[in-house]
Amino acid sequence: MSMEDPFFVVKGEVQKAVNTAQGLFQRWTELLQGPSAATREEIDWTTNELRNNLRSIEWDLEDLDETISIVEANPRKFNLDATELSIRKAFITSTRQIVRDMKDQMSASSVQALAERKNRQALLGDSSSQSWNAGVADRYGRLDRELQLANSHFIEEQQAQQQLIVEQQDEQLELVSGSIGVLKNMSQRIGGELEEQAVMLDDFSHELESTQSRLDNVMKKLAKVSHMTSDRRQWCAIAILFAVLVVVLILFLVL
């Protein structure tokens, strides 16, 4: 959650580069179609800067394509659904179309002819370059102000988007923290109940041992009483037999 998605970092750089390229393209169009004369240096500089920006944007878009391919190969690892992938693909497609449109207009035959004519006019007008310097400085200053304004708007949008992402992450962290608290309370209750049951089992074990000891004592006493009773019965039987023997002897003597 705390790690920033690299796609949004590259996306921000691409959007910033597109804004710069659009400003250069507008200036390049004004130089070719405007009624005022422009020097060859200004036309060449604007053209080269525009082409370099477009080439850099294309490279960044290729990097974004590679990141999407990696995510599509293992979507579970990056936790991105199909909707988010579609949004990212749409951004790449639309940006690539913007770059393609500007390149097509720059490479059009009519535009090339206009650029060559402007270059010839610039070469013919180099003798009056001193009177043009003030106008060039003003145009460059206006272009810089426009670029700075576009960049400031872009930075504000990115900051607002990052703030929204941070707020969403904070909300998710609060939900996770609440769930952890509930689980902690449940685990504490379960632990208390287990401890109570352990105490009850320990008491029951002691009672069982005491009962077993008392039962053993009773069994020993019963065995002792049984042994004593058996001895008494034997003496009684001997006495009866002796009495019978005496009676028989008396009868024998009498008869």
From Swiss-Prot:
Subcellular localization: Golgi apparatus membrane; Golgi apparatus, trans-Golgi network membrane; Recycling endosome membrane
State which ranges are Cytoplasmic (membrane side): 2-234
Coiled-coil annotation: which residues? 41-74
Membrane disposition: Single-pass type IV membrane protein
The record ties this protein, via Gene3D superfamilies, to: 1.20.5.110, 1.20.58.90
One BP annotation, GO:
retrograde transport, endosome to Golgi
Residues with N-acetylserine modification: 2
Q: Which SUPFAM superfamilies match?
A: SNARE fusion complex, t-snare proteins
Domain named t-SNARE coiled-coil homology: residues? 163-225
Residue segments, region Required for interaction with VPS51? 2-168
Q: Where are the transmembrane segments?
A: 235-255
Classification via InterPro entries: SNARE (IPR010989), Syntaxin-6/10/61_N (IPR015260), Syntaxin/epimorphin_CS (IPR006012), T_SNARE_dom (IPR000727)
Record keywords, A-Z: Acetylation, Coiled coil, Endosome, Golgi apparatus, Membrane, Phosphoprotein, Protein transport, Transmembrane, Transmembrane helix, Transport
What PANTHER family does the annotation carry?
GOLGI SNARE BET1-RELATED
Q: How does it assemble?
A: Identified in a complex containing STX6, STX12 and VAMP4. This complex also includes VTI1A. Binds EEA1. Interacts with VPS45A and GOPC. Interacts with MARCHF2; the interaction promotes MARCHF2-mediated ubiquitination and degradation of CFTR. Interacts with MARCHF3. Interacts with BLTP3B (via C-terminal coiled-coil domain). Interacts with BAIAP3; this interaction is increased in the presence of calcium. Interacts with VPS13B.
Name of the molecule in the record: Syntaxin-6
The organism of origin for this protein = Mus musculus
Question: What taxonomic ancestry is recorded?
Answer: Eukaryota, Metazoa, Chordata, Craniata, Vertebrata
